[in-house]
Amino acid sequence: MKKITVTLLLLASIQSEQKNHKPTPDRAVDIHHSIIDIKIDFLSEKVIGKVSHTFSPLGSSVSNLDLDAEDMIIRRVRLGDKDIPFFQSEEQLHMDLLKSFSWTDTLTVVINYTATPRTGLYFFKPDSSYPDRKLQAWTQGEETDNHHWV
């Protein structure tokens, strides 16, 4: 009976891990550096931001760039000093680089956005239980949740 119970628990554990597993997607670029410039609106719990990503393609012909961008409204995207076409799906920002680039190129995209993060960035402000609490925001996004605010 103990063997059956242990086996069932092991199988249940394996099944629960598989449901939450999201494999690392293949990437088309190597991001070298990011400059993050944000303003935090504590009262509305929003982030108004501009992020610059400097990157190099990993292939010989890369003409678009997809980045995770959940809980964001993208306002503008530029490659160098030129606005480029983009669209958003529910969880990603898709950018058309206007031509193909290769691993010998180093590019910078600048993205202006507003975010209302559900996770990754947390807001604390006074409430009825803690009326003297100071306004504060802190991050705990690591690699999986930062795309909700940056």
Regions found by a protein language model. Give the residues of each.
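Sec-dependent N-terminal signal peptides
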Residues: 4-12
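Acidic/His-enriched low-complexity segments
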Residues: 14-150
